[in-house]
A protein has these predicted regions:
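Functionally critical loop-and-helix segments that line ligand-binding/catalytic clefts
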Residues: 271-320, 325-460
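Extracellular beta-strand-rich solenoid/capping regions of secreted or surface-exposed proteins
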Residues: 39, 43, 47, 58-71, ...
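Boundary at the C-terminal end of the N-terminal hydrophobic targeting segment
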Residues: 21-26
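Acidic Gly/Asp/Thr-rich repetitive segments characteristic of extracellular carbohydrate-active
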Residues: 27-57
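Bacterial N-terminal signal peptides
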Residues: 9-20
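Extracellular beta-strand/beta-solenoid scaffold signature
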Residues: 80-88, 108-117, 132-140, 160-172, ...
Length: 460
C-alpha cells in the first residue's frame, strides 16, 4: 500500500517517529523546498519510499543508501555544495527522476558528478532529469544493469575540453543502458570503458570532443544516435563484436566514425554528412569553439558574410588496424575523404555502401589488392561514370577509386602541380586500359548504379 505524507524541514523528526507505524508497503512523501539538507529526509525514509520533491531548491549532496526514489515535481532543483557528487546511489534499484541537478565538485580524480551510481547500485534508474553544469553528468561506475534514460545533460561550457568530464561515463557496468538522452558540452558524450553487453541508443550529442567514445567494451549495441558538430562522432577502440547501426554523424570535424583495433563488428545503416565549417574549428587550441558567428542570433536576422570554411569531417570513416568487420548499407557523403583505410586492417567486408561527393572516395596506401564487393554486390560511387547495359543494377566494369597517381600525391603532396601534365595523363590512360599496371589497392568488382535504399542529401 502507498501512503502519502507531507514533510517540511520541521517535520523530519515526526517522519522518523511515524515510520514504525507505517502501513506495509512504500510511502510517497512530499518534501517541501527548504534550507535544511535533504539528506536528513532521506535518512528517515524507509526502503521503497518515494520522496516527491516540491518546486524550489533542495540542498545536497545526498546519498541514497537504500532503495528510494527521488521524484522531482516541475521546478524542483537539487543543488550540491560544489564538493563531490550531488547524488550518490549505493543501493540497488535506487532512482532519480524529474530533477534539475547542479552543483557538483570539480575534481576529475574523484569523478565528481551530478549523479554517481556505485557498483552496489545495480538496476539504478536515472530518468528525465536536467543535469546541468556538473563536472561529469552521470557516472555508472560498476552499476550493473543501470539505466540512464531521457535526461538532458549539459556539461561545462567554459575552459579546455580536456579539463571537463563526460556526459555519461560507463565503467565496468555490464548490461547498463544509456537511452534517449540529450548531451551537450563537456568532453565526451558517452565514454565506455572495460564493460560489456551495453546498449547506447537514441541519444543526441553536440559541442563535444567525441559523441561516443568506446574503449575495451564488447558485445554491445550503439544504435540510432545523432552526433552534430562534434570533433569526432563515434570513436570505437579496442572493442569487439559490436552492433553499430542507424547512427548519424552530421558536420563533425575530424571523423564521422573512427575504428581503432575494433574487430568482428557489424556496421550498417549509418550516415555521415560532411559540411563546410568555419576554419576556426581547427584553430581553437583546445578551447571550446564558440557558435558560428555567421549564424543569425535572432529569427529573421540576416547572416553576415560567410567566413573562410573547410570541409568537415576530414574523413567520413577512419579504419586503423580493425579486422573482420562488415560495413554495409552506410552513407558516406561530403567529406574530404570517404574512407581512410590502413594497411593493417584485414578481413573487412564492404558492400551496399554509398560514397557520395567525397573529394577522395577512398584513401588506401597499401599494396595489397582489396575487392570491396560481397556476394556479387558492391557499393555505389557517385563519381563512377559507368554503364549498365544489361540492366541488372550493377556497372558493367569494375571501379577503382584510386590509381597510382593518387598514391604519389598522398606521399608527396607537392606533386599536385603535375596532375594535369601530359606524363600523368599518359599514366592514367594506361592504367584505365591495362589493369595490370595498378600496383594494388581497392577495387569494386560489382559497383552499384544507384545507392541501394540509401537517401542522399539533396544539394542546393
Amino acid at each position: 500500500m502507498i501512503r502519502s505524507l507531507h514533510i517540511t524541514s520541521l517535520g523530519i523528526a515526526a517522519l522518523a517517529a511515524a515510520i514504525p507505524c507505517r502501513a506495509a508497503g512504500a510511502a510517497e512523501i512530499s518534501v517541501a523546498a527548504s534550507a535544511t539538507p535533504l539528506q536528513a529526509v532521506v535518512d528517515a525514509a524507509a526502503p521503497g519510499d518515494v520522496l516527491r520533491l516540491a518546486p524550489g531548491e533542495h540542498l545536497g549532496p545526498v546519498v541514497l543508501s537504500k532503495p528510494l526514489t527521488l521524484q522531482g515535481e516541475p521546478g524542483a532543483v537539487l543543488k550540491g555544495n560544489g564538493k563531490g557528487s550531488v547524488v550518490t546511489l549505493t543501493a540497488p534499484e535506487a532512482a532519480v527522476r524529474g530533477l534539475r541537478v547542479e552543483g557538483s565538485g570539480t575534481d576529475i580524480a574523484t569523478l565528481d558528478a551530478g549523479v554517481f551510481a556505485a557498483a552496489s547500485a545495480t538496476r539504478a534508474v536515472i530518468e528525465g532529469n536536467s543535469i546541468i553544469g556538473n563536472l561529469y553528468g552521470i557516472q555508472l561506475h560498476g552499476a550493473r544493469d543501470a539505466v540512464a534514460r531521457g535526461n538532458r545533460i549539459e556539461g561545462q561550457r567554459e575552459g579546455r575540453t580536456s579539463r571537463s568530464g563526460n556526459g555519461v561515463s560507463v565503467w565496468n557496468a555490464p548490461g547498463a543502458k544509456v537511452l534517449d538522452n540529450d548531451i551537450i558540452f563537456g568532453r565526451d558524450g558517452i565514454f565506455a570503458n572495460a564493460s560489456k553487453k551495453n546498449e547506447f541508443r537514441g541519444n543526441r550529442f553536440s559541442n563535444l570532443r567525441f559523441a561516443v567514445h568506446y574503449m575495451y567494451t564488447n558485445d554491445s549495441v550503439i544504435a540510432d544516435n545523432v552526433s552534430t558538430g562534434n570533433i569526432v562522432g563515434y570513436a570505437i577502440m579496442y572493442s569487439d563484436r559490436l552492433q553499430v547501426s542507424g547512427n548519424v554523424s552530421d558536420g563533425d570535424r575530424d571523423n564521422g566514425f573512427l575504428f581503432n583495433y575494433a574487430n568482428g563488428s557489424k556496421i550498417s545503416g549509418n550516415a555521415v554528412h560532411g559540411r563546410a565549417q568555419p576554419v576556426e574549428r581547427w584553430t581553437s587550441n583546445g578551447q571550446r569553439f564558440a557558435a558560428d558567428p555567421d549564424t543569425p542570433k535572432v529569427a529573421g536576422e540576416a547572416s553576415a558574410p560567410r567566413a573562410r570554411t573547410r570541409i568537415g569531417p576530414e574523413k567520413c570513416v577512419f579504419i586503423y588496424n580493425a579486422n573482420k568487420n562488415r560495413f554495409s548499407d552506410n552513407l558516406f557523403e561530403g567529406c574530404e575523404i570517404g574512407v581512410h583505410f590502413t594497411a593493417g586492417s584485414e578481413g573487412n567486408a564492404m558492400s551496399g555502401n554509398a560514397f557520395v561527393r567525397n573529394r577522395n572516395q577512398v584513401k588506401y596506401v597499401g599494396t595489397r589488392s582489396l575487392d570491396w564487393s560481397s556476394e556479387g554486390r558492391g557499393n555505389y560511387w557517385s563519381d563512377n561514370p559507368a554503364f549498365d547495359i544489361d540492366g541488372d543494377g550493377l556497372a558493367d566494369n569494375p571501379y577503382r577509386p584510386n590509381d597510382m597517381i593518387d598514391r604519389v600525391l598522398w606521399q608527396a603532396p607537392a606533386a599536385k602541380v603535375l596532375v594535369n601534365s601530359p606524363a600523368v595523363q599518359v599514366i592514367r590512360w594506361a592504367q584505365a586500359r591495362f589493369p595490370a599496371v595498378f600496383p594494388g589497392g581497392v577495387v569494386d568488382s560489382h559497383p552499384l548504379m544507384k545507392p541501394d535504399g540509401i537517401k542522399e542529401t539533396e544539394t542546393p
